Amino acid sequence: MRLDHISYVASHDQISDVVNRIGSQISTAFIDGGIHPKFGTRNFTAPLLNGQYLEIVCPLDHPATDATPFGQAVKKKAEAGGGWLTWVFSSSDLAGIEEKFGRKAADGYRTRPDGSELKWKQIGVKEIIGSGELPFFIQWLTDNHPSKDGNSVAKISKLVIADDEKLADSWFQDEIKSALTGVEIEWVKPELNEGDKGIVAVELTVNNSKIRLD
């Protein structure tokens, strides 16, 4: 298991501005990741060092947005003004994770504007709707990982997460913490995040400078 990507939400009307702003801050160009037809969302991705990437995602005016957990989570965050949605861990085998959740992972895919398709399985998205501090889990089924799309100069150095219990309510607390090689977690009280648990900010190292994205 390893930290795969971090996900930030913007509204459909604001996503272009957010992509330009964050891309400038981290000195990295985003690419149009295309539409998630199954989830009713669209994303842009920026490659990061260490095989990770940053996703900016928005909800679409589409029935799938309200019909799927990921679409619901993105729409809810967008309606609240946007910001950090979640962190995502990848594994080459989700069987053990599926066993603990008591259900199978859902299939996901998206087609980029150039026609290439990405496929994966994901699980744990239902839980992040009410518990923003929890990550979800993904298994990639294709090799064209978004971290390979362009030049990477930024790396994740710290996650600031509002959670008094420090993931004590997660089945995967130990696995998550051991997978965060080179990434610090700063735990803060939910009161500092308007009472909500979840990611407050992400600190990235860009050309030896620290950049904080709230």
Task: Go through each PLM region and give its residues.
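Glyoxalase I/VOC metalloenzyme domain signal
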Residues: 1-4, 8-29, 41, 47-214
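A short beta-turn/loop motif at secondary-structure boundaries
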Residues: 36-39
